[in-house]
Amino acid sequence: IMAMTTIDKMKDIFNGPKTLLYSKAITDLSKATVDITPEVELPVTVDSLKAAMDDPTVNHYKVIGLAGDWATTAELGDFNVEFVVPSKAKDLLTIMFGEDAITELTKVTLKGTGDATLDATTGFTGIAVEPKKFKIKGTIVIVDDEKENLMVITNIALYATLQWDNSGTEPVAFKFSGSIEGAGKRSIAWLTKGTTTGDV
């Protein structure tokens, strides 16, 4: 007879996210040894990071004369991922909308405002973006505050939307939201730093 697993053995938790890393590559989590090469570290607004599954849809089959279910079937709920990034950096805009949606503006000049600072001939530089529908694919790695544990979510399919609701107190930000396109694939992993080479 196998011994019961006691509650102290169940304290295997993940919390306190500190850093979110993004890689455009899909990660094969069915392999025992995996390399992930992030391209960018994303600044994520506190408490905006969410990863949760919707409740399952339960179908109840009943027969005459019995109060309970004769049979039940279910469909799993969608896995939802979302977070908010308060940045308008070029690298971020490229991730969100694609290379072809980005144009670098080398000089934009304001004229006739009557404000010498705004009308300066030096002009302004920046980035123009077409905020089109663009599927963000790849892998995100969430690092805990002790850098000892990781949560990896791959096969992501996210979309970005501009958010600037509280313009007096908050910066321009983009909300990433979407799901996992990983039917039949291992798409989530929780990892703990190995104590020696080769440990996981």
Q: Which residues does each predicted region cover?
A:
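Polar/acidic, low-complexity leader/linker segments enriched in S/T/G and N/D
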Residues: 2-44, 197-200
